């Protein structure tokens, strides 16, 4: 009960990522005091789970009943944006920086000749790839420590999603015969780094003089739904805790002419078509 007033007071005045971190720290201190004389690990585990249950309940209640969000934004309001082209282009062909709130991504562009295309080999086929987008998510991006090494499944998936979003606007080989490689690195994360990498990569391509057909941007749409599913709220530009405690992460990328890539992650049994249509309008 001690933690509820603190959460209710701070959820509307701070970044939700900071609030959840403070809540976890306070919760651990309270648990240490309560269970310092016992070795009942099962009871401690149940108590730890309660924090996440309450945070989940608090985020849903705020969106469904108060029509607002943890950092005070409206449900259809995006975070503050910042974009910059260049900066390190003296050692690379192009670069772009894109900030969306606490999510920061740096993309760099390198151009090569036709002989630099990536060779794709399968059991029964071989092909060449002229445009590549790679995504890196180092541990420090999320405020953690860890091994920095080969690419993991998450990085591969996010990189390929951004690559699919950008491929339709890449110029034809006959007009731009160069091999194009973009590397996006998340330097700070609070949700939607994959979509921020699409924006940063677009800036890097334009900074490097690649004649893309039109700029591409991406955003993540979240969902808060009640237990029965008859009441819901869509959230534009979800941040980390809203992704973690929310019911949907609907990644949508496209241009002024239409959608170029979609990825849907859900935590509920299913999402109604009407909800997806509303998210896309």
Q: Where is each model-derived feature located?
A:
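Glycine-rich, flexible beta-strand/loop modules in the N-terminal catalytic cores of phosphate-handling
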Residues: 95-178, 258-268, 272-277
């Amino acid at each position: 009960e001690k933690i509820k007033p603190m959460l209710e007071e701070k959820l509307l005045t701070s970044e939700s990522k900071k609030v959840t971190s403070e809540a976890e720290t306070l919760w651990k201190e309270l648990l240490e005091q309560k269970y310092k004389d016992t070795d009942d690990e099962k009871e401690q585990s149940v108590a730890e789970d309660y924090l996440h249950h309450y945070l989940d309940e608090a985020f849903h209640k705020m969106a469904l009943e108060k029509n607002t969000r943890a950092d005070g934004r409206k449900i259809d309001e995006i975070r503050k944006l910042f974009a910059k082209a260049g900066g390190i282009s003296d050692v690379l062909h192009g670069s772009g920086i894109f900030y969306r709130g606490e999510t920061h991504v740096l993309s760099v562009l390198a151009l090569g000749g036709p002989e630099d295309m990536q060779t794709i080999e399968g059991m029964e086929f071989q092909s060449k790839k002229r445009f590549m987008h790679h995504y890196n998510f180092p541990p420090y991006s999320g405020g953690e420590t860890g091994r920095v090494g080969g690419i993991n499944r998450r990085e591969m998936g996010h990189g390929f999603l951004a690559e699919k979003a950008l491929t339709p606007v890449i110029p034809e080989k006959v007009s731009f015969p160069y091999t194009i490689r973009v590397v996006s690195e998340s330097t700070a994360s609070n949700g939607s780094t994959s979509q921020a990498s699409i924006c940063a990569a677009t800036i890097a391509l334009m900074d490097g003089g690649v004649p893309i057909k039109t700029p591409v941007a991406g955003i993540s749409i979240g969902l808060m739904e009640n237990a029965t599913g008859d009441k819901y709220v869509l959230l534009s530009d979800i941040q980390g805790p809203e992704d973690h405690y929310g019911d949907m992460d609907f990644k949508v990328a496209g241009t002024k002419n239409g959608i170029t890539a979609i990825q849907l992650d859900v935590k509920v049994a299913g999402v109604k078509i009407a909800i997806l249509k509303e998210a896309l309008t």
